[in-house]
Amino acid sequence: MDPGRSPPVQPFPSVADDRAHGLQAVVDSGLMTARMSSQNTARNIGTGSADGVRRHFASDNYAGITPEAWAALAEANQDHEPAYGNDRWTQAAADRIRDLFETPCEVFFVFNGTAANSLALATCCQSYHSVLCHEVAHVEKDECGAPEFFSNGSKLLLLPGDLGKLTPAGIEEAVRRRTDLHYPKPKVVTVTEPTEVGTLYTPQELRAIGAMTKKHGLRFHMDGARFANAVAALGVAPREITWQAGVDVLSFGGTKNGIHVGETVVFFNLELAEEFAYRAKQAGQLCSKMRFMSAPWVGMLSDGVWLRHAAHANAMASLLHELIAPCPGVRVLFPRQVNSVFVDLPKPVIQALWDKGWLFYNFIGEGGCRLMCSWDTREEDVRAFAADLRECAGG
């Protein structure tokens, strides 16, 4: 068996039960949890909560580990297990992912999203190929050239698109733009679901892109750093926006949804997975004590936990949007669809909020801000931030 590759084992009933009861029921329970999260809790504007602990809106990476992931991690620490992914936890986690997507697939665990994206893309192309991505894609803006590095030079070709999304027409134009030997041959399309600006591809849009990639013999990669939030928001089965839409390989994110470290690379195109274990090892991505990366996935993929936490984060962002959109000087930049709210704020308001101790990113032009909710965001935090924003904006 290849180190780092998990053999298929029998499906776990808990994942199958989620399908039997319907994904929407799991999402609904998460929304109910979100609505009830602050009942009987006094709000303190100065601290952001009654207990003095404030949840911020800079990134879902700021949040801690979910109780379910933490419990699984602790349980995995009870005894000795084989190393390099040959342990029962890694086998169980990989099996739950296969069951979640309802199809045979190869599953690999890596340390972070940059590794997941870069190694997945490198597997899909040669150095003389190019990768078509949106001009604001994470692989372009926030991965320090890693996709080009790990593919030995495959060029990223940047495409425009409204709301952070690629279109079939844009892909076809890029493929046909040049076909001569002096131009890097397009070989892969990568999309981010949800996008860098918090918008969603619908299943229909993804199927259309998948059909275009098939038409031109391209591979189809999905950056799913917040894949759970997309599934929760769309109310679809994971298969509907991945392999059934033509996706060959998915970077399935766990860190932003409450896992301590580690993403998975899920190959629906099994041929592409051949020798990926060697690529991961060479890139320093083979964890010797792999169970401590994989065990939290077992906890998260039990009884719909992963989806409930994502639905809660989405619901908190929906409430945040509802509370701050009417405030003076606030301009919403993109539709709120998952766990992020993008707004333009006057610079004095941004500074005043920072002075009050709130942490959030301001990286879109002069006043563009991203406010991100996470699995542990509380309603009291949202209302405290909204109240401070209204005060700072003079509303």
Label for each model-derived stretch:
Residues 11:
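Cationic, low-complexity basic patches in intrinsically disordered or flexible, solvent-exposed regions
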Residues 30-356, 361-377, 385-393:
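Conserved PLP-enzyme active-site core in the AAT-like
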